[in-house]
Amino acid sequence: AFGKHTAIPHHNSDNTPLRNGDIILIDMGMKYKGYCSDMTRMIFTKNPTEKQKEIYDLVLKAQKAGIKKIRAGITGKKADKFTRSIIEKAGYGEKYGHAGGHGIGLDIHEQPSLAETYKKPLKENSIITVEPGIYLEGEFGIRIEDMLLITKNGNRNLTKITSDL
């Protein structure tokens, strides 16, 4: 998605042309030997506005906070709260719009879910995504998504592409 369509978390493509200055949200993955991958990155075709940079930095801060704390044994609900609480404290809680992440494996979306409703613990050696986002209707949206291997004492980020602007 690009331009104002980035404010729609799962936008279906249409015939809208890309314009100079549009931001681009790329949610991508592939399958390898039957297993899925998933990541999201933002591309700015011009220098971001102050508001775009503020939102980007906030989403990245939330994601990094979640990644720092996620480990085996915590619930999906608690994992979601690690990212969501930062966005809520900044006043954008209602603009989050989806779960904080999901399990991934043979299917692109599997259990566990990083969501308010998921009260089971994350299991060691499972793969999840952490994907906070803020979506400002009619303007733009920002989402950053990485895949993590859950370990006993933390996690290992499997996404090797930078999330720097």
Model regions and ranges:
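Active-site neighborhoods and metal-handling regions in enzymes and metal-associated proteins
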Residues: 1-165
